Design a protein with these regions (language model features):
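Acidic, glycine-enriched catalytic cores built around paired aspartates
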Residues: 5-6, 10-12, 24-25, 40, ...
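Helix-rich catalytic cores of soluble enzyme domains
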Residues: 1-35, 41-47
Length: 334
């Protein structure tokens, strides 16, 4: 299971379908039919997006490896910049919510109206109202997110552990912020929406519905402050960032010592994989490619010599081919 064994051939990876559910089977990322169900949906959706925004570099570190580095950014795989895709309708809901003021009514169509104070209606978000942007590494597909950047040789547990821990930490902070507003005298529903509005604005940089392969997006991602690092060893450093240490420490998932140990293993594994592949390539070149090329070169030389014995024959094409073979074999042997 190699993510990208040969240039020009499609690589291999995994799509991790991720959602959250209650112990009674309720999908927390599934749009509902009532105002309270949709409030729940938006709350968990926004918290998920915010978690990805804060830890986009760490999520990339969780799926990066020596072999996956060759796949990410290629035409058949997500880019090496983590962003979230929500689709047109879901994005419109969040944008209108973020722009609303006080008791403004947010109209989506003639029948569906959502008010900040009354929390009367939020439109049901149907599964087929979200398209499937294949260039997005973290896409919302109706009732779940697809994390599409995990390598074929990687265990899904690492990426899921990071995502779950980041989400748990985000939800804990969300509750603290809501509780603070309630203690200040604000009603619970109003407090929830005020915090959600702040979060939607704060994490808007992670939302991108366009072509993740384009050079324009790479430039735009830098402007947005997203992690655009492409060097695998440097990407692993995200595990030791202060924000990462705090998140894992607060959730009790990993201690600083455990993260340092895991990162050391990642660096060592990366180095060994590069060394192994380098040695294999050297063996293939010196013991298989060069001998065959030399044998073919000898056949061409014999052909050119025999052609020279016959007046009028032109061996220039064969001579040029011999020169190319000689040049490339000499470069390999350097």
């Amino acid at each position: 299971l190699h993510e990208k064994p040969f240039k020009g051939i499609n690589g291999s990876g995994k799509h991790n379908n991720w959602s959250l559910g209650t112990d009674t089977g309720v999908n927390l990322l599934g749009p509902g039919k009532t105002a309270s169900e949709n409030l729940q949906f938006i709350t968990f959706l926004v918290n998920a997006i915010s978690a990805v925004h804060k830890h986009n570099g760490l999520l990339k570190a969780a799926i990066m490896s020596a072999t996956n580095a060759h796949r990410l950014g290629a035409n058949e795989a997500p880019p090496a910049i983590i962003s979230t895709f929500l689709g047109t309708q879901v994005s419109a809901v969040l944008d209108k919510l973020a722009a609303s003021k006080g008791d403004d009514a947010i109209r989506f169509d003639a029948k569906n109206v959502f008010k900040m104070s009354g929390i009367s209606h939020i439109p049901t978000l149907l599964l087929d109202n979200t398209d499937r942007n294949r260039t997005s590494p973290f896409a919302f597909t109706g009732n779940r997110f697809e994390f599409r950047a995990v390598g074929s040789s990687d265990n899904c547990a690492e990426a899921m552990s990071v995502l779950n821990a980041a989400m748990a930490h985000e939800l804990a902070e969300f509750k603290q912020n809501v509780d603070a507003k309630i203690e200040a005298g604000m009603k619970k529903e109003k407090a929830i929406y005020e915090v959600l509005k702040q979060m939607i604005k704060a994490c808007k940089a992670i939302r991108f519905d366009g072509n993740g392969y384009s050079d324009e997006w790479k430039a735009e991602a830098r402007k947005r402050g997203l992690d655009c690092e492409t060097s695998t060893p440097l990407i692993f450093d995200r595990y030791l960032d202060k924000q990462t240490l705090r998140m894992f420490g607060d959730t009790g998932v990993f201690s600083k010592v455990e993260l340092e140990a895991r990162t050391e293993v990642k660096w060592e594994t990366y180095t060994k994989k590069i060394q192994i592949e380098g040695r294999v390539l050297g063996d293939l070149a010196m013991n298989h490619i060069v001998p065959i090329a030399s044998k073919y070169e000898a056949l061409l030389l014999d052909k050119v010599y025999k052609m020279s014995q016959i007046p009028g024959l032109n061996a220039s094409a064969d001579i040029e081919l011999i020169k190319k073979i000689q040049y490339h074999t000499a470069e390999i042997q350097r």
